[in-house]
């Protein structure tokens, strides 16, 4: 075995371990290539087979909920998920995860530019306090931007007076999916599918505290920082945003 193969085996093993054993050959190839070592999907498949590594993803499971309060807010986004800059359009949703002896609810906010998770919150109740905390985290972490559009489904935790007041305070424009149509918020659905197939154990977590720790680790350490995203051309959300701001600075200096 030559030195190059030994190095590739090591990088593949590290990437597989970092993904909690969920990454397949394509994801492994993108991760290693993003680290500066070129690796094709075909070769990754062969080396993973040699190392006895397989992707241990579970079937997807999706959570939908009904609205308890109807308000007249149009679908401003209309499935236009490709945006041109960060902080133009954010999207949010809620899912549930088993934690020992009851369900825990996870609310997330994603910036659609690079599919980066910018806000999240976990609670034992799927209410507007949960979704409000996720939105507040996003708003603070992004430097309190103006002119953002926020898109979600028609769940009561997004249509409540309390949540709409928070949007008004942050000067964020609200957009709601059509009732019962999950494709109107497809990027969030894909994130939840990735989380549950790549990271969350089949039987859930042993406790609320363990779930908080592991899901935060997935979002910060793996999904945003290490996991390549097809929408970003194989780049991670963090790298895609970094390149945008770097290019924006270059254009500004040139101008």
Regions found by a protein language model. Give the residues of each.
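An active-site-proximal beta-strand-loop segment
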Residues: 79, 83-118, 124-126
């Amino acid at each position: 075995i030559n030195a190059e193969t030994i190095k590739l085996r090591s990088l593949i093993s590290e990437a597989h371990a970092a993904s909690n054993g969920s990454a397949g050959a394509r994801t492994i190839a993108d991760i290693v290539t993003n680290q500066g070592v070129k690796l094709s999907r075909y070769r990754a498949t062969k080396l993973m087979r040699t190392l006895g590594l397989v992707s241990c993803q579970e079937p997807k499971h999706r959570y939908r909920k009904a609205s308890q309060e109807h308000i007249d807010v149009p679908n401003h986004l209309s499935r236009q998920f490709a945006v041109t800059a960060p902080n133009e359009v954010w999207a949010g949703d809620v899912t549930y995860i088993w934690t020992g002896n009851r369900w825990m609810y996870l609310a997330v906010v994603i910036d659609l530019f690079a599919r980066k998770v910018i806000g999240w919150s976990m609670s034992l109740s799927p209410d507007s306090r949960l979704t409000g905390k996720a939105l507040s985290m996003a708003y603070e972490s992004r430097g309190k931007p103006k002119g953002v559009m926020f898109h979600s489904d028609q769940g009561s935790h997004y249509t409540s007076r309390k949540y709409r007041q928070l949007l008004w305070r942050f000067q964020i424009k609200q957009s709601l999916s059509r009732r019962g149509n999950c494709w109107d918020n497809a990027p969030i659905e894909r994130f939840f599918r990735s989380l549950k197939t790549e990271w969350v154990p089949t039987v859930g977590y042993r406790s609320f505290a363990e779930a908080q720790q592991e899901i935060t680790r997935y979002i910060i350490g793996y999904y945003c920082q290490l996991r390549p995203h097809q929408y970003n051309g194989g780049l991670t959300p963090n790298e895609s945003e970094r390149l945008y701001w770097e290019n924006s600075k270059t254009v500004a200096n040139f101008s």
